[in-house]
């Protein structure tokens, strides 16, 4: 029986943080951010060099989300990848989209480290790195009218 020669994108296999991203990959999204969504706070990673602090924590209250969006604008971020964790991603997603960012919602199972220690800082940096190299696929997000109907 002949083996298949078809290659599968790394992200569909669920990339492990222990596997380094090959150096020969081209940076697709140079001004990309990664957000690790949590119930009480969100950790945000931006590329090294665009600010003094590459990772910041923002609480999940509305004023903090506006501060998050403002900080991303100051850093020159154009596109953002975030996990679809529970319902906590919804306010962040909607606010960032409203502010003009290209936002990708990604399945947390595709970007999580399967084994080993996990920290929110490492997670947001990993999401940012994968998004920089174009290795993340965004989840389907229906039109605003459908989202409004689903909220009832």
Residue ranges and their predicted role:
Residues 1-152:
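Phosphate- and other anionic-substrate recognition elements at nucleic-acid/protein interfaces
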